[in-house]
From Swiss-Prot:
The gene is iolW. GO terms for cellular component: cytosol. Keywords: NADP, Oxidoreductase. The lineage of its organism: Bacteria, Bacillati, Bacillota, Bacilli, Bacillales. This is scyllo-inositol 2-dehydrogenase (NADP(+)) IolW. Its EC number is 1.1.1.371.
Amino acid sequence: MITLLKGRRKVDTIKVGILGYGLSGSVFHGPLLDVLDEYQISKIMTSRTEEVKRDFPDAEVVHELEEITNDPAIELVIVTTPSGLHYEHTMACIQAGKHVVMEKPMTATAEEGETLKRAADEKGVLLSVYHNRRWDNDFLTIKKLISEGSLEDINTYQVSYNRYRPEVQARWREKEGTATGTLYDLGSHIIDQTLHLFGMPKAVTANVMAQRENAETVDYFHLTLDYGKLQAILYGGSIVPANGPRYQIHGKDSSFIKYGIDGQEDALRAGRKPEDDSWGADVPEFYGKLTTIRGSDKKTETIPSVNGSYLTYYRKIAESIREGAALPVTAEEGINVIRIIEAAMESSKEKRTIMLEH
């Protein structure tokens, strides 16, 4: 249910600075912060002055990081700059005593993430990673089925994140560089979801490559996370004209098959904001199918999806800052995603399974 929207009540407003105003800042962060009473977007560091004036006329456009880190009124900084700059920008904000939300992927390496976590702990500031797809309608539905016992004793968990982008685009995410490519960009989402459900695996076996002509970085990945009896298979390609199921989950007596993808991103890209209770609703044709076997009885039923809610992440961040509540995504969880990515790249390069230390 949508609550705490602008104008509903007065709160102790958290003044926010945003670093970067590309896709992430303008679509995934700005619109959510804008509708919640808890936040006020004070400054945005970007060269896209006209876009900010159009979208957030009350926000000040700045061009230097210090104009945000040196502002004592700003409590929270959202880091949405290119992934290779996350470490540098986040460390500067931490040292300035700011709470920080980092766009995923957290960092290029787990070592960088651990250094940031230590710095945040020493400074007494909060550090979280924006793994928003924990609040996709399909994933929330899967969590509900597991918690209710409708999916038990899972042996196979398979999730895909495919796109049809046969031509390499002139975007930093698709250029050779630090923390670029689809494993960092899209894979981090489904890795985080998997770790959120099952924790860290025993081992990782992966194939990571560039499939498209003229590709400069990874555009295909296939990971198997070994949990013993449970095997989690995560994959994504960039030349996929027609998608199969996004999720295929099999347990001892039940299976859940789900097509389609949460529509919050498309809605935000189209300029919509989450201002009513229809936000995050799934398309009925994409509702998942739960098949259950009890003895000789086999039943398949359609499961209406739980509404998605990216707003939940920022509601919880406000509660963490103002009330000391637990973070919705911890720095350690962000680091664990990078540990899996590093293991996957090592596995692919060396053509072997990488055992993980716990």
